[in-house]
Amino acid sequence: SGSCSLKTCWLQLADFRKVGDLLKEKYDSAAAMRISRKGKLELVNNRFNSPTPEDLVYVDPSPDYCLRNETTGSLGTQGRLCNKTSEGMDGCELMCCGRGYDQFKSVQVERCHCKF
């Protein structure tokens, strides 16, 4: 007599926030490389350890996202609203790139069409 067993396997994506946080961490610690005369990648700064296969590396530096750049399509951060109390990416210190920021208070009055 033959017996059957059913086995089901599936892959599931990790939490999106965790993936984003990991990528941001790798981006922030990416290794600067240059191409040697022999056509091989080498570290720009030999004081750092060689990157592992899991590390990010780059040859060209990232553009300055604080400034408007027509070539990359970046609008920059000038004129954007920021959160004064946040230490995250939406916080004024990071988003305004050290340029300082204007503060204002806004009061919005809206009719809510409430019925009692």
Swiss-Prot record:
GO terms for cellular component: extracellular space. Glycans are attached at N69, N83. The keyword Secreted applies. Palmitoleoylation is required for efficient binding to frizzled receptors. Depalmitoleoylation leads to Wnt signaling pathway inhibition. Disulfide bonds join C82-C97. GO terms for biological process: canonical Wnt signaling pathway; cell fate commitment; muscle cell differentiation; neuron differentiation; positive regulation of convergent extension involved in gastrulation; positive regulation of non-canonical Wnt signaling pathway. GO terms for molecular function: cytokine activity; frizzled binding. This is Protein Wnt-5b. It comes from Plestiodon skiltonianus. SMART domains: WNT1. It is found in: Secreted, Extracellular space, Extracellular matrix. Belongs to the Wnt family. It comes from the Eukaryota. Signal peptide: none annotated. It holds the Pfam family wnt. A lipid is attached at S1 (O-palmitoleoyl serine). Keywords: Developmental protein, Disulfide bond, Extracellular matrix, Glycoprotein, Lipoprotein, Secreted, Wnt signaling pathway. InterPro entries: Wnt, Wnt_C. Ligand for members of the frizzled family of seven transmembrane receptors. Probable developmental protein. May be a signaling molecule which affects the development of discrete regions of tissues. Is likely to signal over only few cell diameters.
